[in-house]
Amino acid sequence: MGEFIHTNFLVKVNLSNYLKIKNKIPSNVNILAVSKGFKSQEIKTIQNIGQNDFGESKVQEAYEKQLLLKDLKQIKWHFIGRIQSNKIRKIVQNFKYIHSVDSFEK
């Protein structure tokens, strides 16, 4: 229970900071919210105030959130973690953007 309260507090602090800078950045700049470790309800809260880009580095954790939040069509999922060859298909199918490449196989 204490961990949830602590996490919830951090989300509130970050939302406050987010709202302060949101209107100060140019319109062609997107904020990428790293949602690793946050619950789907917390993602929904920040998405409701206009944050649509979310970064995840763990494929299975991200996939579970994507299923729970599939009705929020505005969300753009970014994969920001190390790519493992056995997870490439799932990454390509479930993320709009991929920001990392681990290695090229010959």
Task: Label each PLM-derived region with a short phrase.
Residues 4-106:
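Conserved alpha/beta-domain cores
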